[in-house]
């Protein structure tokens, strides 16, 4: 846990999933402080919109103003709810919207934590363009190293005149005034042909590797299991290309597409609808934190390409949680398959959790691993 003192309230905040005590990661950053310093409680008029609030630092601080928290991360929503409870703040103080929803009209203040992907930022700025006015105060913040010329040019192109502040604690802010500059329409998704198939893959703004097949997925697809039955999971599904391939290779199986990103799940659904509509009745689409709340001993197989970062921080906490959830939800003799960068040494992590691990394939960058849930029902 970490403590954030600001001009609105003193907060105790924690990351979600929780980090280990040996190498704790903070649940807020200097950019959160810097953004809050710019606001005077008496100046806030109209709806307050907060975009990409990773662990709820801004939403908790401004809870008395009933803010809208907007983003593309269900884990961030869970983190914010947990931190509201931790600080004795009514959860209903914050209204949660995902990035594909319509934003509230005529906000008085918009606070933006600049996301990792420029495509998501552009989608969010275009959505804001439909609702902000020239009187809306628009402030964005990030680590100084994450604000580039392209970032500032995007604000200027979509919303209007843009300036940046001096760095403070290695954070920097962007101030923008809306003046409705001329702007051409842009498609909601990016599409490309999947090599070796007749499929067209559609990707919303925040989907990993949205402009083409990433090399890890390409390697994984060469080694996916065939002729499985029952329910199998594409965990952390992204655009669903792995799950789509599983549907094709396992015609007797049902595939559950799971991701914490609403845009990823929407992309997966779109890709099944457009490429294998006859398989829709063998699909389930789930926005979730890994397999939280899913009953034990449900699945015959789980497949995933686990992330090794959360927001801008490098961490294996999300992957570790995925592995534990997979073990709980697999049937006895159920199988977990993963692809990962070789340097992450997931072999020993999986062996620690499952008691076994086998290398299916490897190249100079990636490894495909398989582990089996053994033992009695427990």
UniProtKB/Swiss-Prot annotation:
UniProt-listed Gene3D superfamilies: Vaccinia Virus protein VP39
Any one Gene Ontology molecular-function term assigned to this protein's record: 23S rRNA (guanine(1835)-N(2))-methyltransferase activity
Keywords of the record: Cytoplasm, Methyltransferase, rRNA processing, S-adenosyl-L-methionine, Transferase
EC class of the enzyme, as a word: transferase
Catalytic activity, reaction form: guanosine(1835) in 23S rRNA + S-adenosyl-L-methionine = N(2)-methylguanosine(1835) in 23S rRNA + S-adenosyl-L-homocysteine + H(+)
Documented EC number(s): 2.1.1.174
Record carries keyword Transferase: yes
InterPro entries xref list: DNA_methylase_N6_adenine_CS, rRNA_m2G-MeTrfase_RlmG, RsmC/RlmG, SAM-dependent_MTases_sf, Small_mtfrase_dom
Transmembrane spans: none
Family: Belongs to the methyltransferase superfamily. RlmG family.
Protein function: Specifically methylates the guanine in position 1835 (m2G1835) of 23S rRNA.
Name of the protein in question: Ribosomal RNA large subunit methyltransferase G
Species assigned in the record: Escherichia coli O139:H28 (strain E24377A / ETEC)
């Amino acid at each position: 846990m970490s403590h954030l003192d600001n001009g609105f309230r003193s907060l105790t905040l924690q990351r979600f999933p929780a980090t280990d005590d040996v190498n704790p990661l903070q649940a807020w950053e200097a950019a959160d402080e810097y953004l809050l310093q710019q606001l005077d409680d008496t100046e806030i008029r109209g709806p307050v919109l907060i975009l990409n609030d990773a662990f709820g630092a801004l939403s908790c601080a401004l809870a008395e103003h009933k803010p809208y928290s907007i983003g593309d991360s269900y884990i961030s929503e869970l983190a914010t709810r947990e931190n509201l409870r931790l600080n004795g703040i009514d959860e209903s103080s914050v209204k949660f919207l995902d990035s594909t929803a319509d934003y509230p009209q005529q906000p008085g203040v918009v606070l933006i934590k600049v996301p990792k992907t420029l495509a998501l930022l552009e989608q969010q700025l275009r959505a804001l363009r439909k609702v902000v006015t020239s009187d809306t105060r628009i402030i964005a913040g990030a680590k100084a190293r994450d604000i580039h010329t392209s970032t500032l040019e995007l604000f200027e192109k979509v919303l209007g005149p843009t300036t940046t502040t001096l760095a403070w604690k290695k954070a920097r802010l962007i101030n923008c005034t809306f003046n409705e500059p001329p702007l051409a329409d842009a498609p909601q998704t990016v599409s490309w042909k999947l090599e070796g198939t007749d499929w067209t893959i559609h990707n919303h703004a925040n989907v990993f590797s949205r402009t083409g097949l990433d090399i890890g997925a390409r390697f994984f697809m060469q080694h996916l299991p065939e002729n499985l039955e029952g329910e199998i999971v594409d965990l952390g599904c992204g655009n669903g290309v792995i799950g789509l391939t599983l549907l094709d290779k396992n015609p007797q199986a049902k595939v559950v597409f799971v991701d914490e990103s609403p845009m990823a799940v929407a992309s997966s659904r779109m890709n099944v609808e457009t490429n294998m509509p006859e398989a829709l009745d063998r699909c389930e689409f789930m926005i979730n934190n890994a397999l939280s709340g899913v009953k034990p001993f449900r699945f015959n197989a789980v497949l995933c390409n686990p992330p090794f970062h959360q927001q801008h921080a490098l961490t294996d906490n999300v992957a570790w949680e995925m592995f534990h959830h997979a073990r709980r939800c697999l049937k006895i003799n159920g199988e977990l398959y993963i692809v990962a960068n070789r340097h992450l040494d997931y072999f020993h992590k999986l062996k620690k959790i499952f008691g076994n691990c086998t290398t299916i394939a490897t190249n100079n960058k990636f490894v495909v691993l398989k582990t089996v849930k053994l033992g009695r029902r427990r």
